[in-house]
Amino acid sequence: MVRQTLHLEYVRSLYYAYFHASLTYGIIFWGNSPSAKHIFKLQKRVIRIMFKVNQMTSCRSLFKILHVLPLPSIYISEILKYVKFNLHCYSANAQVHIYHTRKKNDLSIIPHSTSLYNGSFIYTGLRMYNILPSNLKDLPALKFKQEI
C-alpha cells in the first residue's frame, strides 16, 4: 500500500523514521538475546508489508532494494562500532605479553568461565573485532564507521 503510492526514497525514509530508530535503540544490549529472533521476524514483516508481497517471499532481495541492513547485520555493525570507539578501554595482546606473539595486535580477551560473559556484547565485540582484517582495524573511527 505505502509502496504503491510513494517513491522508494520516501518508503526508505518512512522505514528509518518509524521502525529503524526503535529497532536500533540499545541493540548492543539485547541483540544477542533469544527475543531478538522475534524482532527480526517483525522487521521482515514490516519490509513485506511495505512491498505488498506475501509472507512466504524471501526478504533478502527486498533488504537490498531498500538498502537496509537486517537485524543481525545491524547488531554486528553496532558492536564493532562500539569496540572501535572505545579502544582506549581495551588492551592489545602486545601490552599483555612481554614476548611477541602472532596475534600481538589483536585485543586481549579476558579469560572467563561463565556463559554469562560468553554471551555479553563486550566478549562478542572483541571476538568480532579481532577477526577483522588489519586494514579495517587501522582506519580512523569515522572512516571505520563508513566502511562497516
For each feature predicted by the language model, list its residue ranges.
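Hydrophobic/basic alpha-helical segments
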Residues: 1-148
